[in-house]
A protein has these predicted regions:
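Residue signature of alpha-solenoid helical repeat architecture, marking inter-repeat boundaries
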Residues: 11, 51-52, 95, 135, ...
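Amphipathic alpha-helical segments of tetratricopeptide repeats
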Residues: 41-45, 81-89, 122-129, 133, ...
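Residue at a conserved register position within TPR or TPR-like alpha-solenoid repeats
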Residues: 24, 68, 101, 108, ...
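Bacterial C-terminal helix-turn-helix
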Residues: 505-568
């Protein structure tokens, strides 16, 4: 009986191919690596698990499919290894089996099964010594960091991302390390370490600037855009998102990250629309006051009314245009996700559409989109998206309470639903380390407790304090504004601060006199600031303290945005 023939020479998996693919990953020579794989399409299409280096090639294919190579689906290639002859899989070397688990982990990531993926990567990392391949270990750490980030476990994600970066640096692969730094910068941003996040991201951008790694360069621009949006710099955010879209389009006009940037751009335009709506409302209020004071002066009133109506029409046209453009961006993103299924991305599209419909007063459409977002998120146990959907549903129900819509025989039904959604959002947010998300959940619980049905300012104050503690020193622009809204509502209700009640009865707990004095100053200065028209100079004069101290205390209690340079 003759010896078993090996595959033809052009279908052999030689060490040179694996080395070339690895070098291109390390140097971020993306087009060269993809061209190399395209030239071996026959080899990949006919990949035989019994070949030498088959499992190693599979691991490298997983890396390149993640980068952007559009070869056979990873799950299809893995099935060939599942259908091995009896006993052959068990005869794989430890190194080959680890490579197989690497590929299975990436396949799970593609399916958004993050917990399953983490299990595969934990196995790989537990046998790091047996694998003796720092390149693959660096990738495994990085991939695990990405999974943890999606689950909202930011502290641990940062640890594993740092491990991957250090391994890459140790190998001299500085460009590969820079890719991992982009994720690191986002995680630091989520922890409120904005300056460090920007510094690391800019360093990564400098290292990758001469490469054709357009997806990572797009991710950097997207990161800058999301920072700008969170700070309320919506025009700048749109510029960054447009830049990100340009980068992604160079790699693939239907890239899923391009869809994500379209969804983010829609949210930025929504931010501009909200600012414009506030200006329209302020102008209308000012016009009503002016008209009332000028009664009897018909000529002047008529001219003013015409001017106001003209400005108002222009503003409303611009408002409608912004909302229309936002929905168009979301439709374009939705079309990409239909071709490249992604539950998290599609859920975000539903969410952002719901926000725009809510702003326009279309509660039914908003409710439908928010429910779809939660349903999509629940399928993958995507806690972050589930929390956002529940907060949005809480917002919609509160809007119905204020508009007195559909109360029927039970006028409290919408208020109770709002509270239930808010409470569920808090419970879900505690599964993550997303502090701003938890703060937002507490905020909307407080706004619900303050609505016209519950009218419970004392409970709302507790929620306010929890929200303030959760967002720490770096609230996003929209959360900071909501903090102001909730704080003002609590003050208008005229409730006595629970701390003052307790102190009046001698209940001081373990606090020292100095701590009580500092807390008393926070309470009094915040209330005087509201009474004095939110003017720091008036508070300083009235209480005979320095304006600097007033600003510091207001920032500490969340009544003034930290780092605000506005003088008053």
């Amino acid at each position: 009986m003759g010896a078993r023939k090996g595959p033809p020479a052009n279908l052999q998996i030689d060490a040179g191919l694996l080395s070339q693919l690895r070098e291109d990953v390390a140097a971020r020579e993306i087009e060269r690596g993809i061209a190399c794989l395209r030239s071996r399409r026959d080899l990949i299409a006919n990949l035989d698990p019994s070949q030498d280096n088959a499992a190693r090639l599979l691991a490298h294919l997983a890396i390149w499919i993640d980068i952007g190579f559009s070869g056979p689906p990873l799950q299809e290639l893995l099935q060939r290894f599942e259908h091995l002859e009896p006993g052959l899989r068990s005869k794989l070397s430890i190194a080959d089996y680890i490579c197989l688990r690497m590929a299975e982990g990436m396949a799970a990531m593609v399916e958004e099964a993050m917990e399953t993926a983490i299990g595969h990567f934990d196995f790989v990392l537990s046998l790091g010594k047996e694998l003796d391949d720092r390149f693959l270990l660096a990738i495994a750490c990085f991939w695990k960091g990405r999974c943890l980030r999606r689950r909202g476990e930011y502290d641990e994600a940062l640890i594993y991302t740092g491990k991957g970066r250090d391994l890459a640096v140790g190998l001299g692969h500085l460009r590969m390390a820079a890719v991992m730094q982009v994720l690191e910068s986002w995680l630091l941003f989520q922890q409120g370490k904005w300056k460090e996040a920007v510094r690391i991201s800019q360093a990564a951008e400098k290292v990758l600037g001469e490469t054709d790694d357009y997806v990572t360069l797009g991710n950097i621009q997207s990161f800058y855009g999301r920072m700008a949006r969170r700070e309320g710099r919506f025009d700048k955010a749109i510029e960054f998102f447009e830049s990100a879209i340009g980068h992604y389009g160079k790699r693939d006009p239907r890239h899923p990250n391009l869809a994500r940037s379209l969804a983010n751009m829609a949210l930025a335009k929504r931010g501009i629309a909200l600012q414009l709506q506030k200006r329209i409302d302020r102008d209308a209020q000012r016009h009503r006051k002016t008209s009332a004071s000028r009664q009897g002066k018909a000529g002047a009133t008529e001219v003013d009314s015409r001017n106001h109506d003209s400005r108002n029409q222009d503003s409303r046209r611009r408002l409608a245009q912004l909302r229309r453009e936002g929905l168009e961006h979301l439709e374009a993103a939705r079309a990409i996700y239909q071709q490249r299924p992604n539950h998290h991305g599609l859920g975000t599209v539903y969410m952002n559409a719901a926000y725009i419909h809510l702003d326009g007063g279309d509660f039914q459409r908003a409710e439908e989109e928010a429910a779809s977002a939660y349903e999509v998120a629940e399928q993958k146990q995507d806690y972050i998206l589930m929390v956002r959907a529940r907060i949005l549903q809480c917002m919609i129900e509160n809007a119905k309470v204020e508009e007195e819509i559909g109360g029927g025989a039970d006028p409290g039904s919408h208020a109770r639903r709002a509270f239930e959604f808010g409470q569920e959002a808090i419970d879900l947010a505690k599964h993550t380390q997303h502090h701003l998300l938890l703060a937002n959940a507490y905020l909307w619980q407080g706004l619900t407790q303050c609505n016209s049905f519950f009218d419970n300012p004392e409970a709302a104050r507790e929620s306010y304090d929890l929200a303030r503690a959760s967002c720490e020193a770096n609230p996003s622009d929209n959360i900071w504004q909501d903090l102001q809204t909730l704080g003002a509502k609590i003050l208008r209700k005229g409730s006595v601060h629970p701390a003052l009640k307790a102190w009046s009865q001698g209940a001081v707990g373990e606090k020292t006199f100095r701590q009580i004095s500092e807390e008393f100053a926070e309470i009094v200065i915040a209330r005087v600031w509201e009474r004095e028209g939110r003017k720091v100079s008036r508070v300083a004069a009235r209480l005979s303290i320095s304006p600097k101290k007033v600003r510091r205390i207001l920032a500490r209690v969340g009544r003034r945005k930290p780092g605000s340079g506005v003088r008053s």
